């Protein structure tokens, strides 16, 4: 019974995780589910998981009561057997006396035994549910505690040099036969704008993850301001900023989203409004009844997709970084807004190093350095026109886009 209780606890945790994953999945792809008419599928799958979880919960709740009936039945059967044995072996007087003593002792001991049994079953079930959490705690046991975190916003970044040096970087994802990037060597001088271009699967996002320190190369090295990426961002917080293709918007105010990760007192009007201006959100926010303290709703439900993307750009500019990394950051914007933001980012050249990925070649045309990737390798490096002359595929893409 104890083994069964432990197994039920583990199964309960697994079903909870699986059902929550499905719920997050369907909300994250709700539009696709509606268009493809797959809502019924998700409803059915989530229903199966929740019904299975209900069965496990019901059995888990019932198990402690099984002990009660087992113990009570054992006491009654024991009394019958003892009474019968005494009647056979001795006289009725001894049988009645023995039976009375047994029943009196049983009535006092049985409740205590029952409580111990029920408690042990409950504990065993709870341990099964806690197993994933305990495993995670063991994994994190050697992680040092973070102390004395500096919550001030540094916009000066004294001593930081926005130079990136990549030396023979190679990275292969687990269970993949070929490297995602192979022998990448680059030197990105301070204040320049660099664009990584190439077809899907060429390794653009991988090289960005390596530059940011999200992934460590299997071979080679990456240095930002002379240090490995994670050490650089730890030494100069806010000197490096990143804008993803899909910006995460927290349920809160515009101010809180721009200063995400910082305490409220750090989100001054000057810093927030300055960041909003770069992202061309200042006029929109100024027209709102509560300005920067306007609620954006869960996942930014109260603002448009383009405004969410610009809010992500404003967040990146909050600390006035000296190195800005853009991963398709303007892809969801309309042409006019994209041109305005590209112009604002281009104006940072000289003071801020800008590294970007873009499929719209019009946004990278004015980059100082264009790096063309194919199958994880650098095929050409130079200005837009130089790469265009060196790579026929790139020239063909440019012509298709009217460039």
PLM feature spans:
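A hydrophobic transmembrane-helix motif
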Residues: 1-2, 59-101
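The feature captures the beta-strand-to-loop junction immediately N-terminal to the Walker
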Residues: 197-199
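Primarily ABC-family ATPase nucleotide-binding module
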Residues: 137-192, 228-233, 274, 343, ...
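Conserved ABC transporter NBD signature motif
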Residues: 220-228, 235-238
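Helix-to-loop junction immediately C-terminal to a conserved catalytic motif
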Residues: 212
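Cytosolic ends of transmembrane helices, especially the final helix of ABC transmembrane type-1 domains
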Residues: 15, 31, 35-38, 62, ...
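ABC-family ATPase nucleotide-binding domain "signature/switch" substructure
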Residues: 241, 246, 257, 275-279, ...
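Conserved "ABC signature" C-loop
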Residues: 247-295, 322, 393-396, 402
